[in-house]
C-alpha cells in the first residue's frame, strides 16, 4: 500500500516555513510522504530540501507594496502560477493539501479546491494574511494559532520546536537564582535596529550593581556596531550574531526582549519565559502588535510600541522588575502554551484525507 501524501504550501518567511516543517516531521513519523510547494529562489528553497523534503517548484511572489507596475503584472503572474499548480497537483495527486501561508500558497490552494482535493489552512498570526483570508473560504478545515482570526477557525496554536517545549517549568528554572537579572535580547537573524540602539543606552542609565546581565543576538552584519555601542555605553554585554541553542538561552533567561512574530510569541509561551515585546511597526496589517496582545492582555507578557521605546523609559521599566514578578509572568505565559500544536494539525490533515470528497 502506498504511503499517503501531503502537499505542504508555505513560503517567503520563516514564520510560515518553520511551523510547516514541524508538521512535516510529525507526518513523516506517521509514515506519510511529504512534498512541499514553494519558490526555490526564496527562503523555502534553502530550508526545505536539506530536511529531506522534495520541493515542488512554484515561481510566484506577492506584489503588495511593490508599486503599480507590479500590480499590473499580477493577473498574468497569477495565471501562470495557477497553471503550474494545476500541473503539479495532477502529477503529485496528494491525499491532502496543507496551506501554511505565504503568497505561494494562494495559487496552490485555489487549484486544490478547484480539483476537489481536501484543503486545510493554518494561519499563524493574529491577523490573517491575504492568501489565507481567501483560502479559508474554500478550505475543508480552517486552523489558527490565535483566537478569532478567521471564520470557522479552530484554535490549535502554532507548532513550536520540541526542544523549547521540553524545557522544565518556570518555577523549576527560576528556583535558586540570585544576583542580577538575566536578560536575553533577540532581534532576529537580521537584527532589530531599535533594540540595538536603545538597549546599550538604557542599560548605561542603570546603576551597575542593579543592571541586568545581557546576551544580545543581533545578526552578523550588526555585530561590529552593536559591540561598539555597548563599549561606548560602558556596559558589559555578550553580543552574538547567532544563538545555536535558542531553547537553552530562553531557559536560562529571566527576561526576553524581542519582536512579536507569531512563532516568537508561541515560543515565549511554550518556554514559559517573561517577555517584553517590541513589535515591528511596519509588519503587514500591524500583525505583530496583535500577536503580542494575545499574551500582554492576559498579563502574561509586556508590550511596548517601538515609538515609545526610549532609553529612559526602558531603564525605568527595568529598574522596577523583580525576579518573583518575572516568574509569575512566565508561569502565566506557559498557561497559554500549545505544545501539541504540530501533532494536532497533523491529526486534522489525517482526518481531512480520510473524509470522502
Curated annotation (Swiss-Prot):
Give compartment(s): Cell inner membrane
E.C. designation(s): 2.4.1.227
Reaction catalysed? di-trans,octa-cis-undecaprenyl diphospho-N-acetyl-alpha-D-muramoyl-L-alanyl-D-glutamyl-meso-2,6-diaminopimeloyl-D-alanyl-D-alanine + UDP-N-acetyl-alpha-D-glucosamine = di-trans,octa-cis-undecaprenyl diphospho-[N-acetyl-alpha-D-glucosaminyl-(1->4)]-N-acetyl-alpha-D-muramoyl-L-alanyl-D-glutamyl-meso-2,6-diaminopimeloyl-D-alanyl-D-alanine + UDP + H(+)
- Broad class of enzyme this protein falls into: transferase
Pfam families linked: Glyco_tran_28_C, Glyco_transf_28
Q: What does the entry give for GO biological process?
A: carbohydrate metabolic process; cell division; cell wall organization; lipid glycosylation; peptidoglycan biosynthetic process; regulation of cell shape
CDD domains recorded for this chain? GT28_MurG
- The signal peptide, as residue positions, is none
Q: Pathway involvement?
A: Cell wall biogenesis; peptidoglycan biosynthesis
Which residues take part in binding UDP-N-acetyl-alpha-D-glucosamine? 13-15, 125, 161, 189, 243, 288
A GO molecular function annotation here is: UDP-N-acetyl-D-glucosamine:N-acetylmuramoyl-L-alanyl-D-glutamyl-meso-2,6-diaminopimelyl-D-alanyl-D-alanine-diphosphoundecaprenol 4-beta-N-acetylglucosaminlytransferase activity
- Major subcellular site: membrane
Which superkingdom is the protein from?
Bacteria
According to the record, the segments passing through the membrane are none
Q: Which InterPro entries match?
A: GlcNAc_MurG, Glyco_trans_28_C, GlycoTrans_28_N
List the membrane topology term(s).
Peripheral membrane protein
UniProt record similarity statement: Belongs to the glycosyltransferase 28 family. MurG subfamily.
Per its database record, what is this protein's job? Cell wall formation. Catalyzes the transfer of a GlcNAc subunit on undecaprenyl-pyrophosphoryl-MurNAc-pentapeptide (lipid intermediate I) to form undecaprenyl-pyrophosphoryl-MurNAc-(pentapeptide)GlcNAc (lipid intermediate II).
**Official protein name in the record:** UDP-N-acetylglucosamine--N-acetylmuramyl-(pentapeptide) pyrophosphoryl-undecaprenol N-acetylglucosamine transferase
Q: What is the name of the gene encoding this protein?
A: murG
Amino acid at each position: 500500500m502506498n504511503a499517503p501524501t501531503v502537499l505542504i504550501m508555505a513560503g517567503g518567511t520563516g514564520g510560515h516555513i518553520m511551523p510547516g516543517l514541524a508538521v512535516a516531521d510529525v507526518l513523516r513519523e506517521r509514515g506519510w510522504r511529504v512534498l512541499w510547494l514553494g519558490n526555490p529562489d526564496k527562503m523555502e528553497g534553502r530550508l526545505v530540501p536539506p530536511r529531506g523534503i522534495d520541493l515542488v517548484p512554484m515561481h510566484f511572489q506577492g506584489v503588495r507594496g511593490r508599486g503599480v507596475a507590479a500590480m499590473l503584472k499580477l493577473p498574468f503572474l497569477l495565471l501562470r502560477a495557477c497553471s503550474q499548480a494545476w500541473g503539479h497537483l495532477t502529477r503529485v495527486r496528494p491525499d491532502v493539501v496543507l496551506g501554511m501561508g505565504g503568497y505561494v500558497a494562494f495559487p496552490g490552494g485555489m487549484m486544490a479546491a478547484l480539483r476537489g482535493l481536501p484543503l486545510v489552512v493554518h494561519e499563524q498570526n493574529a491577523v490573517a494574511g491575504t492568501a489565507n483570508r481567501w483560502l479559508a473560504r474554500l478550505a475543508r478545515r480552517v486552523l489558527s494559532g490565535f483566537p478569532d482570526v478567521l471564520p470557522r477557525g479552530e484554535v490549535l496554536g502554532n507548532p513550536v520546536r520540541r526542544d523549547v517545549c521540553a524545557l522544565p517549568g518556570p518555577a523549576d528554572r527560576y528556583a535558586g537564582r540570585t544576583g542580577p537579572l538575566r536578560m536575553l535580547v533577540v532581534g532576529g537573524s537580521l537584527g532589530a535596529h531599535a533594540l540595538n540602539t536603545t538597549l546599550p543606552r538604557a542599560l548605561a542609565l542603570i546603576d551597575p550593581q542593579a543592571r541586568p546581565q545581557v546576551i544580545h543576538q543581533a545578526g552578523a552584519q550588526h555585530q561590529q556596531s552593536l559591540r561598539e555601542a555597548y563599549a561606548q555605553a560602558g556596559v558589559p554585554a555578550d553580543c552574538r550574531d547567532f544563538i545555536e541553542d535558542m531553547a537553552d538561552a530562553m531557559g536560562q533567561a529571566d527576561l526576553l526582549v524581542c519582536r512579536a512574530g507569531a512563532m516568537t510569541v508561541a515560543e515565549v509561551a511554550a518556554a514559559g519565559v517573561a517577555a517584553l515585546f517590541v513589535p515591528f511597526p511596519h509588519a503587514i496589517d500591524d500583525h505583530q502588535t496583535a500577536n503580542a496582545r494575545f499574551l500582554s492582555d492576559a498579563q502574561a507578557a509586556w508590550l511596548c510600541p517601538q515609538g515609545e521605546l526610549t532609553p529612559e523609559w526602558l531603564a525605568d521599566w527595568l529598574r522596577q522588575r523583580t525576579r518573583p514578578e518575572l516568574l509569575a509572568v512566565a508561569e502565566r505565559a506557559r498557561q497559554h502554551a500549545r505544545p501539541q500544536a504540530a501533532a494536532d494539525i497533523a491529526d486534522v490533515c489525517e482526518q481531512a484525507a480520510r473524509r470522502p470528497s
